[in-house]
Amino acid sequence: MLKQGKMDFFVTFNNVNLTYFTGFSGATALLIPKQGEGTLYVSAVNYEQAKTETKGLAVDLLKRGENLMQKIAAKTAPNKLAVDSLSIESWRSLAKAVGGEEKLETAGNLILELRSVKDQDEVKLIREACNLAEIGMQMAFETVKPGVTERRVAAEVEYAMRKKGADGTSFDTIIASGISSAFPHGSCTNRTIHQGDLVVVDLGATYQSYRSDMTRTFTAGKSTEKQMKIYETVKVAQQKAFKAISPNISAAQVDGAARRAIEAAGFGEFFVHNLGHGVGLEIHEAPILSPDSKDTLAAGNVVTDEPGIYLPGYGGVRIEDTVLITSNGAERLTTGYYSLETLR
């Protein structure tokens, strides 16, 4: 970005981007020059840890009372800076320090685009996060039954993942049962699961800052014919989308493959969200798989494939996998538990 543009430095204050570039999450800012060594700015509480955990960077201690913007200006003057993720107030403060807004330029979506293509090390971490998610889903499969509360299921799921090495969850675990399963982002409550309920389980694990995302739908007991029809429709839609995923295809085309399958079964109006999104250091990243997405998929993208049908007052079904886009197609990083019933 620096070599191709008119900027001489890039500076980021964004916690996620700081982790992406340095592997260290406790920094305040990172300054990268067009040539030479970058500088990581940290407070005293993180100084020794930063020196130990970061390589190839100068670590600059921010002493109490020092002005970060002025320190950056002193190192970059009289050059121009590309800036990422800054509040209006901080932008103005930095502009004042460097001598005017004409010295600054937003980095726009360049960093998001860079992060959307994962390297081998990132894929390895995401793969492990997905393995941990599968452990959580196994526990959900074993725990979902009449008489158990949603929060009990969530607690068992999260403990199972942490016990096997997860740093935490990718997001608040969703266990949505009964009519609440018709809420795409339903919360986890103390509701008791009843016989015959549809139960949507949406979970993910974090491993060394990288995330996974996986959803399955179960019934607590024997499924009805209507539940099975909805489930099989979603399952077919997910498979259609998965088969469509490949490098250089538009994200909108992949969304369309799933959406057409659901529409053909008569449930089109009940598929109310996008098909998927990128996954990495954040649970929602580029690219976006939606009907109006302008994104084109690329090898190294990690995305979700998560069609769903949600009938208000009745219940819903969603099936979701985390998917790696390869040079010639796609690979599911989460697998298993594609059966609706939890009790045989």
Annotated model-derived regions:
Residues M1-R344:
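Active-site neighborhoods and metal-handling regions in enzymes and metal-associated proteins
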